[in-house]
Amino acid sequence: RLVLEQLLEFCYIHTGKGNRKELMYSPKSRSLTYLYWPWFTTIAWVILLVGCAEKDTRFTQMDPKDLGIEFENQLSYTEEFNPYTYRNFYNGAGVAMGDINNDGLIDLYFTGNMTENKLYLNKGDWKFEDITERAGVACSGVWSAGATWADINGDGLLDLYVTKSGMPGGQNRNNELFINQGDLTFKESSAAYGLDVVGLSVQAAFFDFDADGDLDCYLLNNSIRSVGAYDLIEGQREKSHPDGNRLLENRDGFFVNVSEETGIYSSAIGFGLGITLSDFNGDHRPDLFISNDFFEKDYLYLNTGQGGFKEVSDQYFSALSMGSMGADAADLDNDLLPDLMVTEMLPETLERQKTKQTYESWDKFSLAGSKGYHKQYPRNAVQRNLGEHGFAEISRMTGLSATEWSWAALLFDMDNDGLRDVYVSNGIYKDLLDRDYLAYMANEEKVRQMIQEDDEVITKLIDLMPSKAVPNAVYRNKGGWKFEDMRETWGMQTPSFSNGSAYGDLDNDGDLDLVVNNVNMPPFIYKNNTDQQANALQLSFKALGKNTFGVGTKAIIYYGGNQSMGEQFPSRGFMSASPNRLHFGLGAAKKVDSIEVIWPNRTKSVLK
């Protein structure tokens, strides 16, 4: 008789407006065959039951101060430190969502570049408490980039990993790991775990790549070298560099760099900005997609199941984004295959395309392809998963190819209709690539005159850079790969300079809220008002071993002739992390017929 090696722990029952009841079931010694029917009655009730009330807009933009949140990622440049001396100056920072005290409420952690990071405890009813000082997670005096929550030591509590970037210098320049002490305090322990890496780190993702029951780490670093130094030189990708990306294997609580032996590139041309985890080829093993800025192609690493990866972007993709930023993977057409969206910098309007966009010559495009840098285009990429036939790039067909200078892509069901929608964070505070500005800079006489008149010529030049806030992109999935712009209809049209973003059900009402980290303005916190309009299913998992929250678990649900697939990988989008929950919109359906759970060790459970 088969015994369940992992247990589905939490099922959320929503009855009416905001009421929730938790069911916990721990049949430690009962067999899979015996559990089959008892789970049927449980899952049948894991539904958000709805009324008929309507709200003015799908989302309400909350005032952060009313919630107890006072944070702003403020950036200011000097003659010594600015976009010319540090190319990622305006890339912004992230936001990580996670339940740090297991009270069922999702807490918020914001990273800041020149601002201290902030941790806010969710007190319920849209009230948050700043516990940064008590928790000891401010990361003062250094440039923080991304953040993610993961139970590193397997004690059932979420720990925090913060990646550092910016110019060298300052205290605690290394990435920091904060181990949760269980009393709303954390202990910095990066050196003890081998995670005290120093570099231009962007984000980390924790997952169990070798299926041994603990969490390993992929660390994304942006090259410290200038872009032009390696432009299209052959043979660079295979040369390891100490500041390159790293795959770190968890060996009894200490993380060891295994990049070379596992087939992971760790070169000086890895200008990485995004990590995306998913089972792209359907073998129930976690794969990796790495989006690279500038001339280097994106990487698709398929998990071999033999303790390593094989990079297959040339075989699986016909086209890639050129200046790839953030990315996300999710099933956009409910065929049970994860699709992929990668952001780039193509403006939406013709006017802005003429003033912002530059294009490579045909000769350079052809040269890049011939030297192994793939066919790359200056637009977003929407990669439809065709199974054994690879991916089809269909961004122009879907109308999603141009969303401005974009960062995070998030694919999640914003209206609980059973189809995952698209959210993209946009904006660059100072547009270094504005063609009118570049033309001005090309006038040697004007620049020479500025140098003669002002000692602080760099700051003066940056003052002249255009700065225009733009709305973030919000598209409703209408099915059939058709998407509708919903910014104004859903109340999300505020112009901004947005970067890291994450989604999660902050008030446990059965719909997904959204938090966005902005540059030089308060964060956006959007309350989703869908709870009275459609049903939803939320699942959390608990696995045996040290991967306590079941990172990498896949669930497929069947209901009323429909199907939907979700994967639990918190790190996603851009420098950010969403909670350890899977969310399925159900529309008008009030019952789920069955759930198939594929655990990180590839065992399966069927719940009916």
Regions found by a protein language model. Name each.
Residues 52-58, 65-67, 77-83, 464-473, ...:
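Gly/Ser/Thr/Pro-enriched helix-cap/hinge segments flanking short amphipathic alpha-helices
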Residues 58-78, 86-87, 129-144, 187-199, ...:
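Short loop/turn motifs that recur once per blade in beta-propeller domains
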Residues 59, 116-131, 171-188, 228-258, ...:
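Beta-propeller blade repeat segments, especially FG-GAP/WD-type strand-to-loop junctions
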Residues 59, 105-112, 158-164, 217-221, ...:
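Hydrophobic beta-strand segments that make up the repeating blades of beta-propeller
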Residues 91, 115, 143, 173, ...:
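Beta-rich catalytic cores
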Residues 92-102, 121, 144-154, 201-211, ...:
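Beta-propeller blade termini
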Residues 164-170, 221-240, 347-372, 428-466:
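Short, conserved, GDST-rich strand-edge loop motifs in beta-rich repeat architectures
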